[in-house]
Structure formats: C-alpha cells, structure tokens
Swiss-Prot record:
Pathway: Carbohydrate biosynthesis; D-glycero-D-manno-heptose 7-phosphate biosynthesis; D-glycero-alpha-D-manno-heptose 7-phosphate and D-glycero-beta-D-manno-heptose 7-phosphate from sedoheptulose 7-phosphate: step 1/1. Residues 36-197 form the SIS domain. Belongs to the SIS family. GmhA subfamily. GO terms for cellular component: cytoplasm. Homotetramer. Keywords: Carbohydrate metabolism, Cytoplasm, Isomerase, Metal-binding, Zinc. It is found in: Cytoplasm. Its cofactor is Zn(2+). It comes from Pseudomonas entomophila (strain L48). This is Phosphoheptose isomerase. Binds 1 zinc ion per subunit. The keyword Cytoplasm applies. It catalyses: 2 D-sedoheptulose 7-phosphate = D-glycero-alpha-D-manno-heptose 7-phosphate + D-glycero-beta-D-manno-heptose 7-phosphate.
Amino acid sequence: MDMQSRIRRLFQASIDTKQQAMDILAPHIEQASLVMVNALLSDGKMLACGNGGSAGDAQHFSSELLNRFERERPSLPAIALTTDSSTLTSIANDYSYNEVFSKQIRALGQPGDVLLAISTSGNSANVIQAIQAAHDREMIVVALTGRDGGGMASLLLPEDVEIRVPSTVTARIQEVHLLAIHCLCDLIDSQLFGSEE
C-alpha cells in the first residue's frame, strides 16, 4: 500500500469511528455538559487528569475553559492536574505514581467540583485513584474512556457520566476524546453565554 492510500485509510477509520460514536455518545456528552455547567454556576471548578495523550487532552480542556474556546467570554475555572512537574515528581517519588492526581484532588477539590478523568483503556491506576479521591471530596466525575470502560467504569456513581468511545484502537479513541472535549466546550459556552448560531 502506498503512503497516500494509507493516509486515506486512516482518515476513513477516524471518520467511521466518529460516525459510529455520534449517536451513542451524544446523550452522554449532553449530560456531562449539564453537570459541568451546573458546577460552574454554583461556583465550582473543573479538574482534569490523564496520562500521555490523555494528559494533553486534560490540558487542552483546561486551557479552552481558562482562556477561550471559539468566542470572547470570561475565563472559567479549570485546572489540569498534569502540568506541575515538581508536584508530580515529588508525589511519585515520596509516595507512588498512582497517587499523583489523587493527592492533588484531596487538596484542591471541593464538593460540587467536577473531575474530567481521561483514559483510553479505563484502567490507568492513577486515574482510578483520582476518581476515588473525587468521590471522597463529593465531586462529580465525567469519565472519558474507550474499549469496555475498564476499572474506571465500575467505580462510577449514578450521578457520574461516562463517555465511552466504541472502539478498541487507541488512536481512534483519542481522536473521539478530542472531539468530545470540543463538544463539551461548545455546550458549556452556549449554555452559559447563549448560542451564537
């Protein structure tokens, strides 16, 4: 297969996964946006975490809220728990890498805040511990997962929301996670500041 054919095949695989996910995920993304907007209207904040590409997604989400998405508007409170290398490495060194997010949540999280927990497999131990810490702090969890939801899915409470991408391919799951994050940002803005359509 030549390279351009391979590129077209990858584009098509991404399109197919998004089309398959669209109707499945729409109600879950809507529910997650309602949870987030309710928290923001109640003076809550968003915390976000994940590893690797999911850490990048957590930072992307946080930056879109803190700065802006596609319109001028006031900044919204969001913290990516993946960015402070001194905090991450001190917790990993003194305790365990599995606690790098949970210790931050126990310090920063308040009842009514929302944790956006991101893992393509749903099995990242430090994200699982983050969910447990969020529940201890009476926070609501929005989980971005894939595959079968992994250990994260089994921890979620009735008020939590899982956005589980119907795929087993990590790259496709990540692509849909980014789209879901953009949908959340759009829905948050439209609910708080009115639709621009």
